[in-house]
């Protein structure tokens, strides 16, 4: 005799309120109870019986709800003799539970009808065609829309004025910077011209000093010439006639005229040299001024262009900074979202780990209960095999007695009739378990052996093996 357990459970199902109970083996019950109905509510219950451990789950909502309760018996309940009383108690409780469910469904339907009637009574407008009349809110909605549009237009105009003011301020700032640069360049040119003017003033002062010196010399020469002329005229006024045979004297007038001509030529030459030097220096300075003015104009234009480029780059930098700030905000928000999601996932992982640990604990408990049940089953099989062997031995004895009385002899594979033969059945139970201890499969191997002793009874071995 052998037992076969599929999933370690038997099922008791009910769909319309009636229960169907099934059991097997030696009279013990281990299984699940499921109840389904079409109620619009969810409920839960607990069925108590002979089970020492079990589980209960509840699901409901929409147009259906259900409750299931699992019962698993232990060794004491298997060996007890009150199975019929227990099953009757369970059936009574299930019937009372179904009656309670139907009563709750009726009460729920009554409450739904009352709520629906109350809503129909309290709705503005009694007719069903105009249950939701929102026409009185249309004017308020239109007014609010107009206010929103006007506020949006006002806000846009303010933003436009702000932009115009900012652009005007930028233009004035650019003009101010250009004027300031022009002012600095003019001041630099003025400083250079002042230095040139100082140099020209020094040159003019030197020339004036030289001119004054020459004028003083000319005045002194004129005065000396007049004195000599007076002396000569005074001496020529007498009537002294002196005749001397001597060399003729020097004509002072010619000499003075020659000296005057020489000084005038020298003064003219100095004037021409000074004028030429002044013209040369003035031309050089004018050339330098024109060159510097061209360079200043080019530098000014280049500075203006650089300022425009600088303003463009500043605007671009501000836009890039705004984009960077928006990206940073988006990155921070994304990091926050992913951190929240990661925290949720970690919480879910923690919950799943707790559930897995709980499932492992329940599995260990179920494994222990299953081993207890398997031990009970094996013990019962042993007793049944012993009884069967005893019965077979008695039948063989009776048959051999009958054969002797009739004069026949039974065929016994070479043994004498007086030696009672006994078959020894060796059963090997192989369990395949996974890594967490769950039972995958159960195999029973039977080997028949014959012996001459009746004391050899059934021997069973349990060889647990780990599944890969």
UniProtKB/Swiss-Prot annotation:
Q: Where is this region: Linker 1?
A: 119-140
Annotated tissue distribution: Strongly expressed in skin and scalp, and weak expression observed in thymus and tongue. In the hair follicle, expression is restricted to the mid- to upper inner root sheath cuticle, being present slightly above the apex of the dermal papilla (at protein level).
Which parts of this chain are annotated as the region Coil 1A? 83-118
Entry keyword Aminoacyl-tRNA synthetase: no
Q: Which GO BP terms apply?
A: epithelial cell differentiation; intermediate filament organization
Q: Which family does it belong to?
A: Belongs to the intermediate filament family.
Q: What's the protein called, per UniProt?
A: Keratin, type I cytoskeletal 26
This protein's gene is called KRT26
């Amino acid at each position: 005799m052998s037992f076969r357990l599929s999933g370690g459970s038997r099922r008791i199902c009910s769909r319309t309120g009636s229960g169907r109970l099934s059991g097997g083996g030696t009279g013990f019950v281990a299984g699940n109870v499921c109840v389904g109905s079409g109620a619009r509510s969810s409920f839960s219950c607990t069925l108590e019986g002979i089970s020492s451990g079990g589980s209960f789950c509840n699901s409901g909502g929409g147009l259906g709800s259900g409750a299931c309760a699992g019962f698993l018996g232990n060794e004491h309940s298997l060996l007890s003799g009150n199975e019929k009383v227990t099953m009757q108690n369970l059936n009574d409780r299930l019937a009372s539970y179904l009656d309670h469910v139907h009563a709750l469904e009726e009460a729920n339907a009554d409450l739904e009808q009352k709520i629906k009637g109350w809503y129909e009574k309290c709705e503005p407008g009694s007719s069903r065609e105009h249950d939701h009349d929102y026409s009185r809110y249309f004017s308020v909605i239109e007014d609010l829309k107009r206010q929103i549009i006007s506020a949006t237009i006002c806000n846009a105009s303010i933003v436009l004025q702000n932009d115009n003011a900012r652009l005007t301020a930028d233009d004035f700032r650019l003009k101010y910077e250009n004027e300031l640069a022009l002012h600095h360049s003019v001041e630099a040119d003025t400083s250079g011209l002042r230095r040139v003017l100082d140099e020209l003033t020094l040159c003019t002062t030197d020339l004036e000093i030289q001119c004054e010196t020459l004028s003083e010399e000319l005045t002194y020469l004129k005065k000396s010439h007049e004195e000599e002329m007076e002396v000569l005229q005074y001496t020529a006024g007498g009537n002294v006639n002196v005749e001397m045979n001597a060399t003729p004297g020097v004509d002072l007038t010619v000499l003075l005229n020659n000296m005057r001509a020489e000084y005038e030529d020298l003064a003219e030459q100095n004037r021409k040299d000074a004028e030429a030097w002044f013209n040369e220096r003035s031309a050089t300075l004018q050339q330098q001024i024109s060159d510097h003015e061209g360079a200043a104009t080019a530098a000014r234009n280049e500075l203006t262009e650089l300022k425009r480029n600088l303003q463009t780059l500043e605007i671009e930098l501000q836009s890039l900074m705004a984009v960077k700030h928006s990206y940073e905000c988006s990155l921070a928000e994304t990091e926050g979202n992913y951190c929240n999601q990661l925290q949720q996932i970690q919480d879910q992982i923690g919950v799943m780990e707790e559930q897995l640990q709980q499932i492992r604990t329940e599995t260990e408990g179920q494994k222990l209960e299953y081993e207890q049940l398997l031990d009970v089953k094996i013990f019962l099989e042993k007793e049944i095999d012993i009884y069967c062997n005893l019965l077979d031995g008695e039948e063989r004895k009776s048959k051999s007695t009958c054969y002797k009385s009739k004069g026949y002899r039974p065929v016994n594979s070479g043994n004498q009739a007086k030696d009672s033969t006994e078959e020894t059945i060796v059963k090997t139970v192989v369990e395949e378990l996974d890594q967490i201890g769950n039972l995958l499969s159960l195999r029973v191997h039977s080997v028949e052996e014959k012996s001459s002793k009746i004391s050899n009874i059934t021997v069973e071995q349990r060889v647990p093996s780990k599944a890969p």
